[in-house]
């Protein structure tokens, strides 16, 4: 699995979302897009970060595509009623692999992410998030990528979603 870096071309994909039909990265050419790779919606940390992403999306106006390793039914049930205005893709498993995660080099949690995950779990519990069904890879790292108008990766971040850091990055881009 190759880790993507800024300057690399974002791998294309065309996948069904659970809320907005087919999502094809190439159709976002001409617009900046944020690709977010989550774990699964049963994960309290992922629930907490997803709430932050909804708020972030509304505040920044950047196009968002959210990838998750939950089953389509679980993903649709979780986001129902949340007012999600971006596509949520329940990534299909093919021969035991999540191909789009592999294409973007999003693998297992590193040691730093595990420590962050425990800290964030405390915040998630305080926010009332509870663990649901296990789906996907339990050791999966989250990640996010900012892709420019020409399909080139501007930011490649493997780890927990950080809206403050991402907002600063987008502000610096202008």
What are these regions (language model features)?
Residues 48-103:
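Structural microenvironment flanking redox-active thiols in thiol-disulfide oxidoreductases
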Residues 24-53, 63:
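Short active-site neighborhood of thiol/selenol oxidoreductases, capturing the structured segment around
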Residues 10-11, 34, 141-143:
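Short loop/turn microsegments at loop-to-beta-strand junctions
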Residues 38, 68, 148:
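Short beta-strand/turn micro-motifs composed of small residues
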Residues 1-25:
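N-terminal "domain-start" segment that seeds a small globular fold
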Residues 30, 159-163, 168:
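A short acidic/small-residue loop/turn micro-motif
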Residues 168-174:
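Juxtadomain coupling helices with adjacent low-complexity linkers
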């Amino acid at each position: 699995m190759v880790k993507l870096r800024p300057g690399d071309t974002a791998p294309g994909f065309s996948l069904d979302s659970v809320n907005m039909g087919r999502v094809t990265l190439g159709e976002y050419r001409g617009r900046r897009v944020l690709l977010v790779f989550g774990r699964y919606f049963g994960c309290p940390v992922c629930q907490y970060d997803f709430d932050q992403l909804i708020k972030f999306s509304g505040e920044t106006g950047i196009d968002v595509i959210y990838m998750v390793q939950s089953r389509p039914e679980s993903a649709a049930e979780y986001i129902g009623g949340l007012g999600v205005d971006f596509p949520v893709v329940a990534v299909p498993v093919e021969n035991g692999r999540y191909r789009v995660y592999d294409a973007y080099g999003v693998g297992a949690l590193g040691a730093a992410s595990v420590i962050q995950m425990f800290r964030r779990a405390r915040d998630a519990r305080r926010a009332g998030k509870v663990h649901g069904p296990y789906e996907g890879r339990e050791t999966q790292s989250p990640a996010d990528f900012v892709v420019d108008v020409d399909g080139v990766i501007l930011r490649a971040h493997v780890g927990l979603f950080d809206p403050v850091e991402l907002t600063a990055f987008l502000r610096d881009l202008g």
